[in-house]
């Protein structure tokens, strides 16, 4: 499950992929498959969630890693270079490295 907590111990990435609407689901499916097959099994992986913008022009990945070093090691893994090449060929990735400062949940089941 996704972890969203204001923990300074986690490295958080929000990656917004600008994409043509006809490629949105194809890119999402690719990201999900690579995460399932490789990324989630790598040291330091905590969680990843994928979101589709309603206008069809973005895929958003919210991911957390145990540390920036773990994230950088994943990014340098040669097995993932074809994945990164594919993403750049069909989209315009914009990685945003974040610090979670606040996270709120519903106060009652009705709000959930």
Curated annotation (Swiss-Prot):
Pathway: Antibiotic biosynthesis; tetracenomycin C biosynthesis. This is Tetracenomycin-F1 monooxygenase. Inhibited by p-chloromercuribenzoic acid, N-ethylmaleimide and diethyl pyrocarbonate. Its EC number is 1.13.12.21. Oxygenase required for conversion of tetracenomycin F1 to tetracenomycin D3. Keywords: Antibiotic biosynthesis, Oxidoreductase. One of its GO terms (biological process) is antibiotic biosynthetic process. Residues 11-100 form the ABM domain. One of its GO terms (molecular function) is oxidoreductase activity. Disulfide bonds: none annotated. Signal peptide: none annotated. Homotrimer. The keyword Oxidoreductase applies. It comes from Streptomyces glaucescens. It catalyses: tetracenomycin F1 + O2 = tetracenomycin D3 + H2O + H(+). Optimum pH is 7.5. It comes from the Bacteria. InterPro entries: ABM_dom (IPR007138), Dimeric_a/b-barrel (IPR011008).
